[in-house]
Amino acid sequence: MSITPEKKAEIIKRFARHEGDTGSPEVQIAILTERIKNLTEHIKKNKKDLHSRRGLIGMVNKRRKLLNYLKRTDFERYQKIIQELNIREATGSR
């Protein structure tokens, strides 16, 4: 259900702006996206796992907030990460 340290390091290396960057919005969004994919698969198999479903909703909301922040501050990087991660553009006025 969680991502392996090797997979996490690979994601950080791919999306980091500079050496040792683990906190930039791009890295956080990429890690959350991987966790969301894994948890979605878990929920497909375990439909009654409401605790995990609530965690999934929280992760999706956090990713949406990070995407909105990135969209406000640097639209080019926002478009690039949306394309690379193959996720839909955030819509709505929240």
Swiss-Prot record:
The keyword Ribosomal protein applies. One of its GO terms (molecular function) is rRNA binding. GO terms for cellular component: cytosolic small ribosomal subunit. SMART domains: Ribosomal_S15. Keywords: Ribonucleoprotein, Ribosomal protein, RNA-binding, rRNA-binding. It comes from the Bacteria. The keyword Signal does not apply. Pfam families: Ribosomal_S15. NCBIfam families: S15_bact. Belongs to the universal ribosomal protein uS15 family. Part of the 30S ribosomal subunit. Forms a bridge to the 50S subunit in the 70S ribosome, contacting the 23S rRNA. One of the primary rRNA binding proteins, it binds directly to 16S rRNA where it helps nucleate assembly of the platform of the 30S subunit by binding and bridging several RNA helices of the 16S rRNA. This is Small ribosomal subunit protein uS15. It comes from Persephonella marina (strain DSM 14350 / EX-H1).
